[in-house]
Regions:
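Glycine-rich phosphate/diphosphate-binding loop of Rossmann-like nucleotide-binding domains
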Residues: 15-34
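C-terminal binding/interaction regions
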Residues: 12-16, 20-21, 100-166
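Short, structured coil segments at secondary-structure junctions
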Residues: 35, 89-90, 110
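Short, Lys/Arg-enriched N-terminal segments with co-localized hydrophobic residues
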Residues: 1-10
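Alpha-helical segments flanking ligand/cofactor-binding loops in enzyme cores
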Residues: 30, 58, 62, 84, ...
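A short beta-strand-loop structural module common to alpha/beta enzyme folds
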Residues: 38-49
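Solvent-exposed alpha-helices and their adjacent loops that cap or buttress functional pockets
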Residues: 6, 64-68, 107-109, 123
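Helix-adjacent hinge/juxtasegments
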Residues: 56-96
Length: 166
């Protein structure tokens, strides 16, 4: 992918939420789409359609693992439950963020492919700034890459030999 002012052009981003967080997911979907990202919605699609956060988190994480999308944005009430589900998919790193600094760090230091947040925790404008910070940040190498390798080794130690995902 080409780099364009610290972001990847043609990046494909998957979005997922439970039924309680559709509003914020939709706002973030349109926000990043307006910036030129290719956006894919994995649901929930209606507040009347009950979708549990583990289902949404898993869908987006598995799509990254398969290579169907590059990164993900997940939203539930707090961001915690949906990120826990995504993190169960081997090779996936999802970080919960409720501020811009953390959003930058989970990308630079932890090489997270997914950012998660809570509709009950962050407002719309802050959420936009959070995703902007995440997608404008770049993964750092050196000691940070070594630490991510240590996390991958934990997965391997527990039988996930195919855990590495870049």
């Amino acid at each position: 992918m080409e780099k364009d002012s610290c972001r990847e052009v043609n990046m494909k981003i998957g979005f997922g939420s439970d039924h309680a967080a559709i509003e914020l997911k939709s706002v973030l979907f349109e926000h990043l789409k307006s910036k030129g990202y290719e956006c894919v919605d994995f649901g929930a699609y209606s507040p009347d359609q009950k979708v549990d956060y583990p289902i949404a988190g898993r869908k987006v994480a598995e799509a990254i693992r398969r290579g169907d999308i590059d990164k993900g944005v997940l939203v539930c009430g707090t961001g915690v439950g949906i990120s826990l589900a995504a993190n169960k998919v081997p090779g996936i790193r999802a970080g919960v963020c409720s501020d811009c600094f953390t959003a930058k760090m989970v990308k630079e230091h932890n090489h997270c492919q997914i950012i998660a947040m809570g509709q009950r925790v962050v407002g719309t404008e802050l959420a936009k700034m959070i995703v902007d910070n995440f997608f404008e940040a770049e993964e750092l190498g050196g000691r940070h890459a070594n630490r991510v390798d240590m996390i991958t080794q934990i997965e391997r130690d527990y039988g996930y030999a195919d855990a590495p995902i870049k």
